[in-house]
């Protein structure tokens, strides 16, 4: 994976940004905003189409994000539409854009000063504008009414990675970028064909250029194109539409993802941070959600800790783990910051510092640093810099995550559910233990059985952590269970100076000023799957710190002898990635893929899955860093919205991936 380089800008005599790489302006010197409105909104008939649009979400694709002017302009127009048409079917705008050389945040802010009327929207974008990390960044705005998927990287690499189903995902294309004469590499038949693959039937397209090869290329890709009057003094531009689309999907048949059919009600089984984030994402999409939780209140399971570290799980090879956790961590930051505007919960973006405490950890972290991640995401610190960063003496180098920190998952989860409980389309049923799920073929509904009674729902999500084996449908999913104990230690004058979450062969949080305790942990115990206090784990948590930091007196001040602690059971996967998506029918999959290695690609059947049954499981010890994006992914899938990760990364999260990998190698999967 190539690293992302920021755009190199100059500013011409009228204050318009000019690309040094392409020697071209980002927008018209005369009136860039009016040009956007004319070329992309008017010629794509957007105002008229919104009036009669018959789906909940309208999706726009754009080939060059640049300054974000097109996005801000269409967002402004959409807000006007919503105010004027509160009862319209269309409720949500989704904007998917690509950018090889993203502007730095400072340059973006400067560019936006040209349009005071967009200042309020621009400020919202600035707040969540991502660092230069490759692939898709999902930014959810206006309580879910507006979504921006910003893909960072060369569009020739990104476009083939965008997942889509048989119907396509794009309702309108903004074919924008630097002029074809300035950036010939982008304007080619592969681009036009890629746009066509993502387009829905009746998808419209417009572009400022009138170049003949662009018009012919779009026609070859399947669009009906024509020349129209250009903006201002420009004589011509081109616009058109895709009249019909051939059904096709980018998902491999054995990693197929389907949305829920005939969706009118959804049951979520769980009560942790993943369930809360999922319920929020679904309710924002207008869905009716009922939560079933066996406990008296939320966050009684693995999400119940006082303080949890939030930072990405990265590696230098940029494998699936790194490609999931980099955007997931950044999405968690966004999710938490937005939640904090309305809710109260303990958290602090104080940074996370990972010590190079021995040769093995040093080699591992150096290998991670070889991945050339953006400095906003990760930095190497000398021993002196580490001491300054954490606020305590230390004689070790480290890796620092400046955007990381800690939060109280119990408080966040409970606050999210309390907020949801004020809404008409959310119901929480606590102390309701779901015993069985039965699919009623006649009504095409799931029966959710609890203590001698049942209710019916069109879709069900299993998000109950380590208790996933309660249900026959998920009993064979290859996930493990690990007990963890976190110790709570009282503040001392010295320990109160810790300014960053500290990671080593364990972790320690800064003192929470609201309770004058810090957290240190956490144990890993696969043998004793209970939630009883473990005196050995309590001692082990303290000893890990003194073993990794043997030469500092402050490490010995951590006092766990009061036996203050919390225990929970993690739901973990072998490959450290969650299981998110459709629940596979294990027995049927074994039969249908019994001879998978010898089956021709075109003859492979779509994987057998239970109808309208989904799971969000296996978040392990990094659930705080992954749950919000995994929930957003699943809500998007259930509701047939664009998905926020590359298609090959989605395969790494597929709930049936372990079975499929074995079957593709011709191995038996009696158990995993």
From Swiss-Prot:
Subcellular location: Cytoplasm
Annotated GO CC locations: cytoplasm
Keywords: Cytoplasm, FAD, Flavoprotein, Methyltransferase, Multifunctional enzyme, Oxidoreductase, S-adenosyl-L-methionine, Transferase, tRNA processing
Gene Ontology molecular function terms on file: flavin adenine dinucleotide binding; oxidoreductase activity, acting on the CH-NH group of donors; tRNA (5-methylaminomethyl-2-thiouridylate)(34)-methyltransferase activity
Cofactor(s) the protein needs: FAD
Region annotated FAD-dependent cmnm(5)s(2)U34 oxidoreductase, chain positions: 269-672
Record EC number: 2.1.1.61, 1.5.-.-
Classification via HAMAP family: MnmC
Family in the record: In the N-terminal section; belongs to the methyltransferase superfamily. tRNA (mnm(5)s(2)U34)-methyltransferase family.
The protein's name: tRNA 5-methylaminomethyl-2-thiouridine biosynthesis bifunctional protein MnmC
Protein's organism: Vibrio vulnificus (strain YJ016)
Gene that encodes it: mnmC
């Amino acid at each position: 994976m190539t690293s992302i380089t920021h755009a190199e800008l100059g500013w011409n005599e009228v204050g318009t940004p000019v690309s040094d790489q392409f020697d071209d302006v980002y927008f018209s010197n005369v009136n860039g905003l009016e040009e956007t409105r004319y070329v992309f909104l008017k010629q794509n008939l957007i105002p008229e189409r919104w009036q009669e649009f018959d789906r909940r979400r309208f999706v726009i694709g754009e080939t060059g994000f640049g300054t974000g002017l097109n996005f801000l302009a269409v967002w402004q127009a959409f807000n006007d539409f919503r105010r004027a048409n509160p009862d319209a079917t269309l409720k949500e705008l989704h904007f998917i854009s690509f950018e090889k050389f993203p502007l730095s945040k400072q340059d973006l802010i400067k560019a936006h000063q040209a349009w005071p009327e967009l200042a309020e929207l621009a400020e919202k974008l600035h707040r969540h504008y991502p660092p230069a990390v490759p692939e898709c960044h999902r930014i959810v705005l206006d309580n879910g009414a507006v979504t921006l998927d910003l893909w960072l990287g060369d569009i020739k690499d990104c476009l083939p990675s965008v997942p889509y189903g048989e119907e396509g995902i794009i309702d309108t294309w903004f074919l924008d970028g630097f002029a074809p004469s300035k950036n010939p590499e982008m304007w080619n038949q592969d681009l036009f064909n890629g746009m066509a693959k993502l387009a829905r039937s009746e998808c419209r397209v417009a572009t400022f250029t009138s170049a003949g090869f662009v018009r012919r290329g779009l026609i070859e890709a399947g669009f009906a194109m024509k020349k129209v009057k250009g903006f201002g003094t420009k004589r011509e531009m081109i616009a058109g539409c895709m009249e019909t689309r051939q059904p096709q999907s980018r998902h491999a048949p054995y990693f197929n993802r389907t949305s829920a059919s005939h969706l009118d009600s959804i049951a979520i089984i769980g009560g942790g941070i993943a369930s809360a984030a999922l319920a929020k994402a679904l309710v924002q999409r207008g869905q009716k959600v009922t939560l079933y939780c066996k406990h008296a209140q939320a966050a009684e399971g693995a999400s119940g800790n006082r303080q949890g570290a939030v930072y990405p799980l990265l590696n230098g090879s940029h494998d699936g783990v790194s490609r999931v956790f980099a955007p997931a961590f950044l999405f968690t930051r966004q999710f938490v910051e937005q939640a904090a505007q309305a809710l109260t919960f303990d958290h602090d973006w104080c940074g996370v510092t990972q010590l190079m405490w021995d040769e093995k950890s040093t080699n591992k972290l150096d290998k991670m640093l070889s991945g050339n991640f953006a400095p906003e995401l990760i930095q190497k610190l000398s021993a002196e810099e580490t001491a300054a960063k954490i606020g305590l003496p230390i004689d070790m180098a480290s890796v620092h995550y400046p955007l990381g920190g800690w939060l109280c998952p119990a408080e966040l989860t409970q606050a999210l559910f309390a907020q949801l409980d004020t809404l008409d389309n959310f119901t929480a049923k606590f102390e309701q233990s779901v015993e069985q799920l039965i699919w009623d073929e006649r009504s095409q509904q799931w029966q959710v059985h609890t203590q001698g009674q049942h209710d019916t729902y069109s879709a069900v999500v299993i998000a109950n952590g380590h208790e996933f084996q309660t249900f026959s449908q998920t009993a064979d999913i290859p996930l493990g269970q690990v007990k963890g104990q976190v110790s709570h230690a009282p503040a001392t004058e010295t320990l109160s100076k810790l300014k960053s979450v500290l990671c080593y062969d364990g972790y320690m949080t800064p003192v929470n000023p609201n309770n004058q305790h810090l957290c240190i942990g956490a144990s890993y115990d696969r043998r004793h799957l209970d939630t009883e206090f473990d005196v050995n784990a309590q001692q082990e948590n303290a000893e890990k710190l003194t073993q990794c930091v043997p030469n500092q007196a402050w490490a010995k001040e951590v006092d766990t002898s009061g036996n203050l602690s919390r225990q929970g059971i993690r739901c973990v996967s072998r490959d450290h990635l969650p299981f998110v998506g459709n629940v596979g029918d294990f027995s049927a999959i074994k039969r249908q893929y019994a001879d998978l290695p010898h089956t021709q690609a075109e003859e492979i059947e779509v994987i057998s899955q239970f109808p309208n049954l989904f799971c969000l499981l296996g978040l392990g010890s990094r659930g705080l860093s992954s749950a919000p994006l995994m929930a957003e992914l699943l809500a998007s899938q259930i509701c047939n919205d664009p998905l926020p990760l590359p298609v090959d990364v989605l395969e790494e999260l597929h709930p049936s991936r372990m079975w499929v990998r074995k079957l593709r190698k011709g191995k038996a999967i009696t158990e995993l």
